[in-house]
């Protein structure tokens, strides 16, 4: 695909970490790209595997960097996890290892927090991760709770270097229990289908922009989108 064919796409789905920003630093060319999207009436969605922040918090983060983008342009793996449970297990209970972005998304769809006998153990990115939490999760999974992780990223980029991401956090629980987690974020096709639905475009009308071959590019290719790999992450 050449550049003109890419420019002709109606919709653009973009990763965030390593594509739009690195930590709290906006990456070069992003402001111009967003201006081009708006001036050419392109439909666009920032689709992040991170589950830490809500769309409102992501909007505010970009606003602090000088980008004024509506809250409706953000979709996270936390929202994808919540939507999955709302459809597959309405009224379920969960023990959650995660940040407020994940907890609030689950609460909004009626998931009840339960650290005694939950239906699910759900793992997302969080700084509040310790041996006690791992032990609790392991015992709950061994007692029958199903294991879900918000995404399969092993690491994530920051302005200080690489940091452990969700798959690194769920791995000890998998190893100790012998159970494999079900990963919700990219490249899970459920998340990509939701992204296309939110944009209101078909896969052949959209492009995926990301910095990871194992999630962003694979997600785009498997869903029939044109893919763009950037090397900024």
Specify the residue positions occupied by each region the protein language model found:
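HAD-like aspartate-dependent phosphatase fold
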Residues: 1-16, 20-233
């Amino acid at each position: 695909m050449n550049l003109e064919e890419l420019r002709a796409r109606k919709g653009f789905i973009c990763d965030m970490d390593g594509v739009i920003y690195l930590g709290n630093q906006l990456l070069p060319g992003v402001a111009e790209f967003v201006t081009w999207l708006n001036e050419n009436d392109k439909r666009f969605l920032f689709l992040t595997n991170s589950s830490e922040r809500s769309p409102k918090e992501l909007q505010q983060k970009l606003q602090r960097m000088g980008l004024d983008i509506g809250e409706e342009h953000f979709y996270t793996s936390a929202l994808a996890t919540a939507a999955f449970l709302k459809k597959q297990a309405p009224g379920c209970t969960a023990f959650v290892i995660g940040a407020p972005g994940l907890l609030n998304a689950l609460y909004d769809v009626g998931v009840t927090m339960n650290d005694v006998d939950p239906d699910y153990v759900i793992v997302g990115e969080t700084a509040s991760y310790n041996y006690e939490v791992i032990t609790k999760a392991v015992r709950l999974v061994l007692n029958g709770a199903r294991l879900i992780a918000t995404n399969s990223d092993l690491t994530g980029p920051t302005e200080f270097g690489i940091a452990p991401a969700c798959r690194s956090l769920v791995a000890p629980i998998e190893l100790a229990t012998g159970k494999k987690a079900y990963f919700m974020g990219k490249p899970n096709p459920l998340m990509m289908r939701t992204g296309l639905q939110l944009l209101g475009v078909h896969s052949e009308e959209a492009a995926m922009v990301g910095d990871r071959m194992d999630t962003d590019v694979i997600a785009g290719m498997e869903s029939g989108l044109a893919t763009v790999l950037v090397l900024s992450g």
